[in-house]
């Protein structure tokens, strides 16, 4: 099972090694604007799942939102500690 920290480490590794065919690399290459649009899309899906779907569906939507937030963080060069300072 992945944690927030292990997912972030995996995304940083993908950004550094740029494996061919990686969806994460494609998302990073698409830039902050595209990443931000995905964050908004996934946030809306989380909201809808919270109101109308099962806990399992909600958890899956939250995981997708966390993925895109982390892709955006990596794209901007932020570290987890940059965010943790504000929690």
From Swiss-Prot:
EC number(s) reported in the record: 3.6.1.31
InterPro entries: HisE (IPR008179), PRib-ATP_PPHydrolase-like (IPR021130)
One GO MF term attached to the UniProt entry: phosphoribosyl-ATP diphosphatase activity
Chief place where the protein resides: cytoplasm
Broad class of enzyme this protein falls into: hydrolase
Keyword Cytoplasm attributed: yes
Top-level taxon: Bacteria
GO cellular component, one term: cytoplasm
Stretches that traverse the bilayer: none
Record GO biological process: L-histidine biosynthetic process
Keywords, ordered alphabetically: Amino-acid biosynthesis, ATP-binding, Cytoplasm, Histidine biosynthesis, Hydrolase, Nucleotide-binding
Catalytic reaction annotation: 1-(5-phospho-beta-D-ribosyl)-ATP + H2O = 1-(5-phospho-beta-D-ribosyl)-5'-AMP + diphosphate + H(+)
Pathway where this protein functions: Amino-acid biosynthesis; L-histidine biosynthesis; L-histidine from 5-phospho-alpha-D-ribose 1-diphosphate: step 2/9
Pfam family, one: PRA-PH
Entry's localization field: Cytoplasm
HAMAP family in alphabetical order: HisE (MF_01020)
Family as reported in the entry's similarity comment: Belongs to the PRA-PH family.
PANTHER family recorded: HISTIDINE BIOSYNTHESIS BIFUNCTIONAL PROTEIN (PTHR42945), HISTIDINE BIOSYNTHESIS BIFUNCTIONAL PROTEIN HIS7 (PTHR42945:SF1)
Stated name of the protein: Phosphoribosyl-ATP pyrophosphatase
Organism: Nocardia farcinica (strain IFM 10152)
């Amino acid at each position: 099972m992945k944690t927030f920290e292990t997912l972030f480490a995996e995304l940083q590794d993908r950004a550094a090694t740029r494996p061919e065919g990686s969806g994460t690399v494609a998302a990073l290459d698409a830039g902050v604007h595209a990443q931000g649009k995905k964050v908004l899309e996934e946030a809306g899906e989380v909201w809808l799942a919270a109101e109308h779907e099962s806990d399992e569906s909600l958890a899956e939507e939250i995981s997708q939102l966390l993925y895109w937030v982390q892709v955006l963080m990596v794209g901007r060069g932020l570290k987890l500690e940059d965010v943790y300072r504000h929690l």
